[in-house]
Amino acid sequence: VARDETSVIGKRAMELTFEEYCDADLSLIRDYYETTFSHYVPDLAERIFVVRDAHWLVGAVRLRDEQDYYHLCGFRLLPHYQSLGLGSRLLQHACSDLLDKPVICQALPFEKPFYLKAGFADLPLNELEGPLFSLYDQQREQGYQIELLVRQAKAPVYN
């Protein structure tokens, strides 16, 4: 379900649309990631939620549907759209459509407050199973400072 809003930055009104992206070839998402951030290989098993300003794609959240949870595996917002609350609104829009299973993500220490405010909580590594357990365990052994977080299905969110 797309949700349209109007916001103002400086003197320019933004025409915002929050929606789940459903293009089967995922070329727009691939182009967005490769142009603005990093390499991306399209994966049809992911659910992708986007925010557009008019017709411009300005942010995307990628969630992979795993057996017992959704894995937040990508979250990007163009720099000049950051610190305006759009990332929080996009994440809330995505999570509000995922009511059947919790959402798990990894965050760097400086990102943790953002996710805590969005309804996520600490997740001890020993409570995770399967391939993500192996991935996160390996990252910690290699010295990566990551925070493992979970947002339970239907968690209340306070902005």
PLM-predicted stretches and their roles:
Residues 109-136:
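Conserved active-site alpha-helix within GNAT-family acetyltransferase domains
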Residues 50, 56-64, 69-76:
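Conserved beta-strand in the GNAT
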Residues 83-96:
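Conserved acetyl-CoA-binding loop-helix of GNAT-fold acetyltransferases
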Residues 52-54, 151-153:
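Active-site beta-strand termini and strand-to-loop segments that position acidic
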Residues 39-43:
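Short loop/turn motifs at secondary-structure junctions and domain boundaries
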Residues 16-28:
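A short beta-loop-alpha structural element at the N-terminal edge
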Residues 98-110:
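Conserved GNAT acetyl-CoA-binding A-motif
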Residues 1-13, 156-159:
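N-terminal amphipathic/basic-hydrophobic helices that include classical n-h-c signal peptides
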